[in-house]
Amino acid sequence: MTHWIAGDWVLGEGETIQSLSPYNSEVVWKGESATEAQVESAVNAARNAFIEWKKLPFENRQAIVERFAELVKENADSIAEVIAKETGKPFWETKTEAGAMVGKIAISIRAYHERTPYKEREAAGNKIVLRHRPLGVMAVFGPYNFPGHLPNGHIVPALLAGNTVVLKPSEQTPWTSEVIMKLWQKSGLPKGVINLVQGARATGEALANTKGIDGLLFTGSANTGHILHRQFAGDTGKMLALEMGGNNPMVISKAFGDLDATVYTIVQSAFISAGQRCTCARRLYVPEGKQGDALLARLVDVTKNIHVDQPFSETTPFMGPQISIAAAEFILNAQKKLQALGGESLLEARSLGHAFVSPGIIDATNVAELPDEEYFGPLLQVIRYTTLAQAVELANDTRYGLSAGLVSTDDSEWDYFVEHIRSGIVNRNRQLTGASGDAPFGGPGASGNLKPSAYYAADYCAYPMASMEGDACEIPEQLSPGLTL
């Protein structure tokens, strides 16, 4: 059972793909990818289901989505176990992902009413009406780091608005999507409303290239997102929503307050999920002087004692592995590159076997031209600064703009920071990876097109229809100049 198309499970006809557990390299899922013809079949199924689905009263669509939420609750532990086996994230963490899926459904229902409501008013003898209509067939591209939660945050708003969906998950996490699709199957969803196509690059290209989709909701790397952006540049008939990564800065003020609380906030920002969250801190700005020295010494001491292990270890880990051996090698190579440019490792990231990498901290202050890259893993770059204005200027020196943070007990510093920083998510004295599901999620620049996830995803799933209405045509008391009747 590999692909879910038009209400049936079908075997793939393309190249073989498999999912390897990153903590022991065992095969946890195997199948054949969808061919271009199978992708077209999935899109056609979604198109055929669209008219009846959008005509279904909202309350009926909501009932099916809420039934899915109940099934997720009932199967939360098994979902969490699959995600842990496939991504390597600690079991305690994947349990929170299953819970977040349920929470996002309630948020999406509220967002539908608040972001895409029906409104009417009277003006100059006319009834002015605002309605919202679904776009049609939506392609959803899911990432590997939150393979349940993040696709769910696009699928649910799309369905509530009356769209149908073709999901193409990351080739790193096909098992998770298959398990979740079976819950949608049990929810009473009509055939063709959601379709699942598994595969790697060729499958994704086939889905993005097809003329049959009306929009694409993407969460993933900036490189892939930019390819899609260029591809869609001449096609105004398709909506493209991009939620990509960031080279996220975290500035520590001299007035940072409690030392251990600050260190804890940094660790949660940089190393949670083994650094595989798009909002993770990548650059840490620390003041010059003894205060900064003491902070870094304590940070290194705490970080080197972070417990890294497989998800189900009896001694509960804080961090698991990278998603793959290739991803682990990428982080180690990034460290070597920064060292060659003049960076000094305060704590060297090391391979721990399979896809495990220990967290690393590197002082990049003396790197003349710091690469503006997202190192998607547990590698934190430290840059020393002298003034807050300098720190903010350096923090803004990136093409990205997803998340940023300031640790400071000084209100005036926060006022300056929030006024001058360029980022979509800006936190004070809280981890960068902390974000509210009912707030905008996204950022400017290379991080995407501003707010395509979380609460505001509703905006991307329906278009506004403005109407001026009257019961019958009327002739005004005074005709327009040059006109006679």
Swiss-Prot record:
Membrane-spanning ranges: none
GO biological process: arginine catabolic process to glutamate; arginine catabolic process to succinate
Coiled coil segments of this chain: none
One example GO MF annotation: succinylglutamate-semialdehyde dehydrogenase activity
Pfam family, one: Aldedh
Residues at the catalytic site: E243, C278
Keyword field: Arginine metabolism, NAD, Oxidoreductase
Top-level division of the source organism's lineage: Bacteria
Keyword presence, rRNA processing: no
Catalytically driven reaction(s): N-succinyl-L-glutamate 5-semialdehyde + NAD(+) + H2O = N-succinyl-L-glutamate + NADH + 2 H(+)
PROSITE patterns xref list: ALDEHYDE_DEHYDR_CYS, ALDEHYDE_DEHYDR_GLU
Keyword Transferase applies: no
Enzyme Commission number(s) from the entry: 1.2.1.71
Pathway: Amino-acid degradation; L-arginine degradation via AST pathway; L-glutamate and succinate from L-arginine: step 4/5
Binding-site residues, NAD(+): G220, S221, A222, N223, T224, G225
PANTHER family in the cross-refs: ALDEHYDE DEHYDROGENASE-RELATED
Family: Belongs to the aldehyde dehydrogenase family. AstD subfamily.
Function: Catalyzes the NAD-dependent reduction of succinylglutamate semialdehyde into succinylglutamate.
Protein name as catalogued: N-succinylglutamate 5-semialdehyde dehydrogenase
Organism: Aliivibrio fischeri (strain ATCC 700601 / ES114) (Vibrio fischeri)
